[in-house]
Amino acid sequence: MKNYLFTSESVSEGHPDKMADQISDGILDAILAQDPKGRVACETLLTTGLVVVAGEITTSAKVNFSEVARDVVKRIGYDHSDKGFDYKTCGVMIAVGQQSPDIAVGVKETLSDNQGAGDQGLMFGYAVNETPELMPLSIAMSHKLVKDLAALRKANKVDWLRPDAKSQVTVQYENGIAKRIDAVVISTQHADSVSNSTIQEFITEELIKKSIPGNWIDSKTKFFINPTGRFVTGGPMGDAGLTGRKIIVDTYGGHGAHGGGAFSGKDPSKVDRSAAYASRHIAKNIVGAGLAERCLVQVAYAIGVAEPVSITVNDYGTSKVGPEVLEKAVRQVFDLRPARITKDLDLLRPIYSPTAAYGHFGRNEESFTWERLNKVDQLKDAVKTLA
């Protein structure tokens, strides 16, 4: 398919599912700050006036889960019931147990980096040369819109913006290359007092036209701003929120593939998270090295076993050397045992809260170690010897 439209979406930090992700990762970070060896599988549910934190956590850290949850809600901006939630008055229920001893046996640390994977599963990493961050344009722009919208809200540019919001961007491809943005959808929660026309003008002029580079938008680009008309009831009052329910927003916006495992609330012994980060690291370095224009990497694990059961590279026909050579180069350059991933990407740190909103990939912050192009030369050298 050469000529087509492709759409991705993102959601703001005030979306109830993203609130849940941020609370789960806030708790993970609080534990890792005290106990880097803590085992965390933390799930969060939000509904009207209530936060429920559940899961399996084994740690020596002393963390006030309720306090962490309230701090996250406060930082997002839910500080009054008329916004759909209030960190001061919401209930917080804690239902946390310890990690199963059967799982713990499989992931115990050894001196030889042969710590077993925390579960079976398959993980994907993807990269494409459409943006400087080597991410698909549709998801990169979707994230930028809701992130910039939150910045406008927190800067008090207007007094009627509320935390809950969604974005959606449709990109037109010609001969497989992104050419223009065909449509932009923005739905933002707002105060009841503001008119639809005021919302539409502000979002068009202060958000869309300032956030998206002008070369992507033309006179035919369609803008849909709060297309239902009103969006007053939002946050957990409008919809329940749950950790791990925005896995496509978290990754590549529907491009590439997804193995099904969520990220937030999981320590790096869970390959759902660490191996997905490693797969992105591989794919980004392949594309960054100019070895392919587009790349998808799959890895898979058996619980309690360190070495992946499979590694697969798909170059979509954009590589001169082919996927088999790329796969051999990956095996030479990258150690995909979970303990090595954790060490190589320095994952036993409280670095996860920023990942829980606006995407885990395509970010420039220093703590996003899986975004570094630090294996480019090694991959090039490996390909030379193999081709």
Curated annotation (Swiss-Prot):
GO terms for cellular component: cytoplasm. The lineage of its organism: Bacteria, Pseudomonadati, Bdellovibrionota, Bdellovibrionia, Bdellovibrionales. Its cofactor is Mg(2+); K(+). GO terms for molecular function: ATP binding; magnesium ion binding; methionine adenosyltransferase activity. Homotetramer; dimer of dimers. HAMAP family: S_AdoMet_synth1 (MF_00086). It comes from Bdellovibrio bacteriovorus (strain ATCC 15356 / DSM 50701 / NCIMB 9529 / HD100). This is S-adenosylmethionine synthase. Pathway: Amino-acid biosynthesis; S-adenosyl-L-methionine biosynthesis; S-adenosyl-L-methionine from L-methionine: step 1/1. Pfam families: S-AdoMet_synt_C, S-AdoMet_synt_M, S-AdoMet_synt_N. Residues 99-109 are annotated as: Flexible loop. K(+) binds at E43. It catalyses: L-methionine + ATP + H2O = S-adenosyl-L-methionine + phosphate + diphosphate. PROSITE patterns: ADOMET_SYNTHASE_1 (PS00376), ADOMET_SYNTHASE_2 (PS00377). One of its GO terms (biological process) is one-carbon metabolic process. Binds 2 divalent ions per subunit. Signal peptide: none annotated. SUPFAM superfamilies: S-adenosylmethionine synthetase. Catalyzes the formation of S-adenosylmethionine (AdoMet) from methionine and ATP. The overall synthetic reaction is composed of two sequential steps, AdoMet formation and the subsequent tripolyphosphate hydrolysis which occurs prior to release of AdoMet from the enzyme. It comes from the Bacteria. The gene is metK. L-methionine binds at E56, Q99, D239, K270. ATP binds at H15, D164, A165, K166, R230, F231, D239, R245, K246, A262, K266. Keywords: ATP-binding, Cytoplasm, Magnesium, Metal-binding, Nucleotide-binding, One-carbon metabolism, Potassium, Transferase. It is found in: Cytoplasm.
